A protein has these predicted regions:
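Rossmann-like dinucleotide/flavin-binding elements
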Residues: 9, 36, 51-56, 65-157, ...
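A Rossmann-like FAD-binding core segment of flavoenzymes
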Residues: 11-66, 132-222
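Conserved nucleotide-cofactor-binding alpha/beta core module
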Residues: 1-15
Length: 236
């Protein structure tokens, strides 16, 4: 689901149908790009179809939609505690009814996990929106649920800014942290304990959430050959 509750799957199916029916769009499925030469305005690209046939395409622009996926992480006890999951996993559990928000008393979310650092210097641009979306969904099902979001910067654009305000109005608590003072997660008597510096109170605070939700970076799929053909980087 999206921030406003729409189904991306339904939208995607409609979009695919429109592309298939468009008279000026030619679609190649199961096709591999083998070579590309030229410059902006004058490209010549060779593709290999599923039948093994080579076809040369003349075009003026190249848009590389390489795609991405949630990066792996071992931070904050992920993979060791069932109470530590990712935003994508939380969304799946909520969508398919595997998690009942009314059974929870508190949920903590940590943004920029393994992101905007030496390993992944970029911002994925979607993590904050996902956190807001899931936080608002949780609050809609359980208004008394305490939701805390630890963040470095809230990166939402355009109309999504309204959902940041809406989350605050719903009672979601936002706690900012610096890269050199990240939240610390330990376990005491089988419960998660989060210790973090509150910049407003100027002291450490502790939380014991029922669930900890992480936002690891979006990383590119392995498209090294395609990137080499077009001379582009995959980490930007």
């Amino acid at each position: 689901y999206t921030l406003n509750g729409d189904s991306p799957q339904e939208y995607l199916l409609r979009l695919i149908d429109q592309v298939k029916k468009h008279p000026r769009i030619k679609t190649f499925l199961n096709t591999e790009i083998t070579d590309s030469k030229g410059r902006a305005g004058r490209f010549s690209t060779t593709v290999k179809t599923k039948e093994g046939k080579l076809e040369e395409l003349k075009h003026g622009t190249v848009i590389l939609a390489t795609g991405g996926h949630q990066g792996d992480t071992q931070a904050y006890g992920y993979g060791q505690s069932a109470a530590v999951i990712t935003q994508a996993e939380l969304e799946q559990e909520l969508t398919f009814g595997k998690l009942d928000p009314t059974t929870l008393k508190s949920v903590a979310m940590i943004q920029c996990v393994d992101s905007r650092d030496d390993q992944h210097q970029y911002c994925s641009r979607v993590c904050c929106s996902s956190a807001l979306k899931n936080a608002l969904f949780l609050k809609s099902k359980n208004p008394n649920l305490r939701v805390f979001i630890f963040y470095r910067d809230i990166m939402v654009n355009g109309s999504a800014e309204a959902y940041y305000t809406k989350a605050r109005q719903a009672g979601v608590m936002f706690i900012q942290y610096e890269i050199d003072e990240k939240p610390r997660v330990t376990s005491e008597d089988g419960r998660l304990v989060i210790t973090a510096r509150d910049p407003i109170l100027n002291r450490d605070i502790q939380l014991t959430p029922d669930l900890l939700v992480l936002s690891p970076p979006v990383v590119p799929y392995d498209n090294k050959n395609l990137a080499k053909i077009f001379g582009v980087e995959l980490n930007q």
